[in-house]
Amino acid sequence: MQHHIIKSLAVLALGAMLLTGCGSSKSLEKQLAKMPQKAMLLSEVTERGLTLDTLETVYPSGMSQWSADSVPQEYMLSWQKFIYGLRNALVAEGMNWTEPYSLWGRAYFAPDGTVDHYFYTWRGKSQPSEEWKAQFREVLERFLATYRFEYPMNRRFAQCGGVSLRPAQ
């Protein structure tokens, strides 16, 4: 009788996994692998039928393993280095801007800390020109190709945040 109950529970657990989408991450991974580049606007991602919620099944939040007040300082410093690294890459590539620009982005990291994807959207009243946005995307692609998140996670994860690009003084 006990063996029969355990077997029934195993079948129920498998059914629950299938219903919650645990079995669908492989098809999502294939869809992500077909993305034309690492950096894409959020609108382009949603046009492909993806949402941040579905992406979270493959790339859970990097901070989800900690409570809000116990996130390691080294993790937060690694994220700040990502943001500052992006700004420094723009400056190093000779990009100039005279108005402050703001964007929100979500980075998707591989277990070794390399960037699999970065999806973003421009925010605020001040918007860059289409030419500037195209150049930004090129620089962003080069930056993402070589960047490695310093805090060791050893699993896929996502981190999001705003990026403020203030003009150089």
Label each residue range with its predicted role.
Residues 19-21:
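C-terminal motif of bacterial Sec signal peptides marking the signal peptidase cleavage site
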Residues 23-169:
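Charge-biased low-complexity segments
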Residues 1-10:
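Bacterial N-terminal signal peptides that target proteins for export
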